[in-house]
Amino acid sequence: MPVNLPEIVPASLTPIQGIRLGWAESNIKTQNRKDLLVIEICDGSAVSGVFTQNRFCAAPVTLCKKHLDAVKNNATTGGNVSGIKALVVNTGNANAGTGEQGMLDALTTCQHLAEIMAIPVESILPFSTGVILEHLPMDKLLAGLPLAVTNLTTDNWADAASAIMTTDIAPKAYATQVKVGGESINITGISKGAGMIHPNMATMLGYVATDANITQSLLDSMTKEIADLSFNCISVDGDTSTNDSFIVIATGKSNAVAITSPNDKGYQEVFDALLETSQYLAKAIVRDGEGATKFITVTVKGALSIDEAKTIGFSIGKSPLVKTAMFASDPNLGRVLAAIGYASRECDSLADLDTNQLELYFGGLLVAEKGGRAASYKEDEGQAIMNEAEIDITVQLHRGNEESTIWTCDFSYDYVKINAEYRT
């Protein structure tokens, strides 16, 4: 079961003015389950996306980028595509590694939805998640589109969270609200993911919507920064997927003042609320990591750069030896120290890391310093911390002022079982 992940309360997921969501059971991979989602976006909205860095990216990712570029080019040249009007998401099939046919299938999906909704093809962003190297069952997917559009309502966020799940055990959603100049701004989001999770995006999908009025260029920069502080700070297994996507939508329907620059009133409040939502959704993916029994926070302080800190954090967080020790509730200091030591392979500036200066903490307990076990450390105290479902690991490098936090989970027997049986 997920590690301390609260169950979704549908009534708590605030509808976002200008957004409607609809789902269908298309039987793409599994019978009688939600597996197709359409999100309708009102005119005048700003939409921004961040996508996988995997060079083997899926066809829908390529088409998403193309359609976003078409919208941005239209804004400067004038044309018929005035903005993104809809998102369409299917689960059960990633449409990755499917060549020209995969691109044609992604485009055909957009064409059929465009006809149903009477909107331009280029105004639709397609997303797929599931098994790689299998072609989409287009007859099933296309048959589901009219049903999903018929189901469009403003309060479908909980069902939408369920409709994008694959190996997830639990749906993931979050909502919050801030006040700017006495006016409310709402933020609601959903995410999916449980395995093949590592930064630069992973096999995760995240969709966050707000009724704030944010210019397109500012939303683009905010989305990138928020992704770097949330979805790019998680790891379940160290694998980066072909399909990951993070989309932020600002409908502009709130009565609050427009936000056009980081210096504007309300910018920080809205940024913080978007970040809060995104970090919750990112951590929810880790809490629901395939077979996870522990949620682990790794904080690295005293680095020369954020890159140094994040590199060490992920070196610890994606180490199979560290993760299996966490599953066993084994306070194995050596495995953590070893992971710190080989982090220099990924970050050249760590080549001169003085291991005699660093300190390692489990929770608030000093467990290693001066190149070895702390003199005050007692194994039973470390064991007590490892027995907890949530574990904090802190590394103090004492070489600078930068820090970074990442979130990961343990490796259990079930992780192997889930992935060994994934295609069967």
From Swiss-Prot:
It comes from the Bacteria. Its EC number is 2.3.1.35, 2.3.1.1. It is an enzyme of class 2 (transferase). InterPro entries: Arg_biosynth_ArgJ, ArgJ-like_dom_sf, ArgJ_beta_C. It catalyses: N(2)-acetyl-L-ornithine + L-glutamate = N-acetyl-L-glutamate + L-ornithine; L-glutamate + acetyl-CoA = N-acetyl-L-glutamate + CoA + H(+). Substrate binds at T166, K192, T203, E290, N419, T424. SUPFAM superfamilies: DmpA/ArgJ-like (SSF56266). NCBIfam families: ArgJ, PRK05388.1. Heterotetramer of two alpha and two beta chains. Catalyzes two activities which are involved in the cyclic version of arginine biosynthesis: the synthesis of N-acetylglutamate from glutamate and acetyl-CoA as the acetyl donor, and of ornithine by transacetylation between N(2)-acetylornithine and glutamate. HAMAP family: ArgJ. Belongs to the ArgJ family. This is Arginine biosynthesis bifunctional protein ArgJ.
